[in-house]
Amino acid sequence: MNIYSLFVVAIALSLDAFGVALSIGLDSCVKRKNKLLFAISFGFFQFLCTFIGAYSGFLFNTYITYVPQIIGGMIIAFVGAFMIKEGFDNKEEKLLLNFKMYFVLGISVSIDAAVVGFTMFNKISSNYVILGDSVFIGIVTLILSIIAFIISRYLKRIQLVCKYADYIGGIILVIFGLKMMFF
């Protein structure tokens, strides 16, 4: 696979992480450190899932085509529903700031990378090429997640967005989850 094709695949895979990062970034309780940890989590799990998928793709390719998207979509929609609920509750403790969420969201936005690894990278014979391609995808996801957090910082300056950030972020996550499950 040439670098252009790999870059297009990396962008496509990282769009879910971009949308989730944008939604998380709208929450005023999420600090810079949390945003960086989410971006690292998204990039790492994108790399890891692609890498694992490439090695196990030939075994599971026929059986697991739609299941990861449904599971990932359900998790993201579930987190979105909790964000909307937290908007109504106005609690100080946020679900997003729970340490487990770095893993839950990181894995849920990266499940499709495992499917890509199953289908596209399972025919690559060199372990170094698989590792390099997987690292590249992880780095692109990390960078796009950081860009999403930067964009969300400017979106929060809009009074309407700031006032309804939990609801907007939650609705976006629910929509992303539904998109992953059904489209």
Curated annotation (Swiss-Prot):
Quick check: keyword GTP-binding in the entry?
no
GO molecular function terms attached to this record: manganese ion transmembrane transporter activity
Topology of the protein relative to the lipid bilayer: Multi-pass membrane protein
Q: Which UniProt keywords apply?
A: Cell membrane, Ion transport, Manganese, Membrane, Transmembrane, Transmembrane helix, Transport
Major location (coarse): membrane
At the top level, the lineage of the source is Bacteria
- Chain ranges passing through the membrane: 6-26, 36-56, 64-84, 101-121, 130-150, 158-178
Q: Name one GO cellular component term.
A: plasma membrane
Where in the cell does this protein reside? Answer: Cell membrane
- Manganese as UniProt keyword: yes
Chain's role: Probably functions as a manganese efflux pump.
Q: So what family is this one in?
A: Belongs to the MntP (TC 9.B.29) family.
What is the name of this protein?
Putative manganese efflux pump MntP
Q: Which organism is it from?
A: Clostridium acetobutylicum (strain ATCC 824 / DSM 792 / JCM 1419 / IAM 19013 / LMG 5710 / NBRC 13948 / NRRL B-527 / VKM B-1787 / 2291 / W)
